[in-house]
Each structure stands twice: as structure tokens, then as C-alpha cells.
Amino acid sequence: FPGADTFAGEQLHAHSYVDNSIFDGRRSVILGMGNSAMDIAVESSYVAQRTYLAGRSGVWILPKYVFGKPVDQMRNDPRVPFAVRQRFIQAMIRSYVGPPERYGLPKPRHRFGQAHPTISGRILDRIQHGTITPKPNIESLDATSVRFVDGSSVEADIVVYCTGYQISFPFFDEDFLSAPDNHIELFRRVFHPQIPNVFFIGLLQPLGAIMPIAEAQGAWVGDYLIGDYRLPSEAELVADIAADQAAMRRRYVSSKRHTIQVDFDDYLHALSKERAAGAQRARENGFKPPVECLPSAATAAS
């Protein structure tokens, strides 16, 4: 932002955030509307002199619990058309917490499910109690203050940018593998069609926990390595990835954040079907592992 280099206070990205002691007695501005931004704003609000949450665009906010259960454990049957599920969940959110703009937050410019929602059980409560003040996007900074696009400004001591992440693979040469604009084409978010036997576990963003999906991916790769699963042909992989990318572009708001987005239940359902299809291909191939197992060169000690 213009003037950021003149700001006398502290600036950091959410990646560097550890705990809320950095906000103690200070005036903080948190930029972002994702999970990190709202979690950090809530933590700031308990110790900071003032906390401002600046939003670049609106998001749908989900409570952490609905009907006594974690929100990501709500049944989301992939056999039901997405449009039907979308309307039901959006109506439920509106009846449960109301529209975000009621709290002074920006209005989402998309329907529920077209962008990654934010899950927070405390943000709306802290806003209603006046310990967090919503603001629009930042326009500029000067030595002691932050100016917003609506013309208002506040004195600030620290600014935290919760503005997303860049996918990179520093352990690979860029000409071997990279993710420009966070875009990397993988079959079911795990297998690269042109780079055999390199696997990506957990490189996705679900609505829900990553760990159960990563565990399912790991089991899938395990089946592949011992020969119990066989991939489709490279041409089929490329075609499937292209279809998946096209569906993603139709479904989600264009954003670097959504290049690895998946629906938790839909993904696991599709993965289960693919593992079954791959098991049949492996059976027809004689359950041959993809990597030849060679005898060890070691000899027994005398």
C-alpha cells in the first residue's frame, strides 16, 4: 500500500504471527476476512487498546458449532445436487447468524459455496461488544496511521496482513516444478501426470479438516506403491484434470485461493470411487507395483 514504507509501527504477515502478546496495549489493524484474519483479530481484541478488522471483500461466516455439532460434521450428501445444498446452507446461515453486513462487515458478492467461507465462533460476538471495529480495505499508510478506502483513518501501532499464501516448492528447481499464481495441475490433487512417483499429500483447501483427507490420500498412495491401485493413462489424467479445473472455474470466484479448493464430502466420495476403479485396473495388470523392487546389495555379516 502507498506509504507502507513510512509507517513507524510494526507490520507483519499472518505467517509470522505467534501469539497476541504483540498487541498488548497497542492499536492494531488486521487486514483480511479469512480464518487467520478473524482468529487474530479476536485474539487481539482481548489485549489491544483498539482492534480494527479491515475487509477487502465480503465472506460468509459460519459458526463453529451448529445443532451441537462441529459445522464441518454436518451431513453434506454429495448425491444431492450442489445448487440444492447451496440454497439450504445459505438460508441456514442467514437464519442462524444473520447477514454479515448487519455487523458492519462487507456484504459477500457471491452465493455461499462460491468462495471459501470463514469459520469463527467469536468474531461476531466481539464485534457486537465493540472490541473489534470493522473497516473497509486499506487505502494507504503514513507514519502513525492507516487510511481506509471510505476516507476514514485510525491511529495504529501494528498492522497484520492476512492476505493469503503463495504455493512454492523451494526444494525443486522451478523448471522442474512450480505453481505460478498458485496453479498446479494434479489428478485428484495428488498425482502429477508428467512426473511419476512424486505425490502431493494435503496440498488442498477443504471446508473442514485437512487431516482426514490427507489420511485418505496417503492410503491411496500406499495402494499405488504396492500395486493395488493403477492410475489411468496419461491422456486420461490430463483430460480429467482439465475437466476438474473447468468445473472449479465455474464453481468458485476467481482467486488464487481457490486453485486448490475442494468440497470435503464430495472429494472423499470421488476419491473412493476412483480407488475402486484403479483397483480394477491393477487387477487387470496383475497387481504390478509402479516401481521395480530390487534385491538389496547388502550381505549378511559373517
Predicted regions and their residues:
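Short low-complexity, flexible loop/linker segments enriched in glycine and/or proline
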Residues: F67-P70
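PP2C/PPM-type serine/threonine phosphatase catalytic domain
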Residues: Q73-N76
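Flavin (primarily FAD) cofactor-binding/catalytic cores of flavoenzymes
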Residues: F1-Y65, P78-E234, R249-S302
